Amino acid sequence: MANWYRPNYPEVRSRVLGLPEKVRACLFDLDGVLTDTASLHTKAWKAMFDAYLAERAERTGEKFVPFDPAADYHTYVDGKKREDGVRSFLSSRAIEIPDGSPDDPGAAETVYGLGNRKNDMLHKLLRDDGAQVFDGSRRYLEAVTAAGLGVAVVSSSANTRDVLATTGLDRFVQQRVDGVTLREEHIAGKPAPDSFLRAAELLGVTPDAAAVFEDALSGVAAGRAGNFAVVVGINRTGRAAQAAQLRRHGADVVVTDLAELL
C-alpha cells in the first residue's frame, strides 16, 4: 500500500482500500485512471493538431512544429474540455482563431471545429482499437463497491457514457459528470473544482468525505482546489518527473496503478 505523507490523516479505515476513515465516496477520472483510453486521446489530439498546423504552415509560411504527444498533451490538453484544450495549446503557439459554435464541422477553422475534428478521430480510434480497462482499476472498483462507498466518474470527455457502457464499468458507477454534463449545466472544467464538487453533491457527500483519483495535472489541481479528503495521482508513465508534477499540482499520494492501494 502506498505511504501517506500527510501526518494528520485519521486512522485508515481499511487496508483493502488504503483510504482515510472519513472517505465515503470515490470520484474517478476516466481516461488514464480507469481506462487505457488516454493513449487514444493522445493519438487523436496529435493527428488533429499536426494536420491543422501543417495546413496552416503551408498557407502562411510559418514553420511547422508538430504537437508533442508527451509535453504538449500533459501541459495543454490532458483532462480539459475539448474547447479548453484547443485554446490552451493554440495559445502556446500564439495562434488565435474564432471560437465558432459547438456544431461547427471538423473542417471549420474554429476552436469548436478543431475540437470536433479531434472527436471524430477519437471515435474512429475507439471503433478500431476499443477501450481497455486497467486490471488494477477494475479490481479497485470491485473493492470500493464491496466496501459500500459511492462511486462517480468525473471526466471532461463527452464520450464517457459510451466508454463506460462498452467496457462494462457502468455497473460500478452511481453518478457521472462528463463533457455533456459540463455543457448542459454550464459547469467549469478542470482545473476548476466544479465538476468534482458536482459529483460529490450528486452522491450526497461533502468534499471532505470524498477521494479524488486523477492522472492529469489539471485534475489533481481541481481536487486540491475543491478541498477533498485526499487526492490520489496516477502516474502511468512511471517517470519521477511526472510524479513530482502531480504532487506539485496537488496530489497527496502518487501511484502507478490503483492496485497499489489494495
UniProtKB/Swiss-Prot annotation:
It comes from Mycobacterium tuberculosis (strain ATCC 25618 / H37Rv). The active site is at residues 29, 31. Its EC number is 5.4.2.6. The modification 4-aspartylphosphate is found at residue 29. Its cofactor is Mg(2+). InterPro entries: B-phosphoglucomutase_hydrolase, Beta-PGM-like, HAD-like_sf, HAD-SF_hydro_IA, HAD_sf, PGP-like_dom2. Catalyzes the interconversion of D-glucose 1-phosphate (G1P) and D-glucose 6-phosphate (G6P), forming beta-D-glucose 1,6-(bis)phosphate (beta-G16P) as an intermediate. Does not show phosphatase and pyrophosphatase activity. Is probably one of the key enzymes involved in the metabolism of trehalose, a disaccharide abundantly present in mycobacteria and which plays a crucial role in bacterial physiology and virulence. It is an enzyme of class 5 (isomerase). This is Beta-phosphoglucomutase. Autophosphorylated. Monomer. Belongs to the HAD-like hydrolase superfamily. CbbY/CbbZ/Gph/YieH family. Disulfide bonds: none annotated. Mg(2+) binds at residues 29, 31, 215. Binds 1 magnesium ion per subunit. Shows comparable activity in the presence of Mg(2+), Mn(2+), Co(2+) and Ni(2+). Also shows 60% activity in the presence of Fe(2+). Is not active in the presence of Ca(2+), Ba(2+), Zn(2+) and Cd(2+).
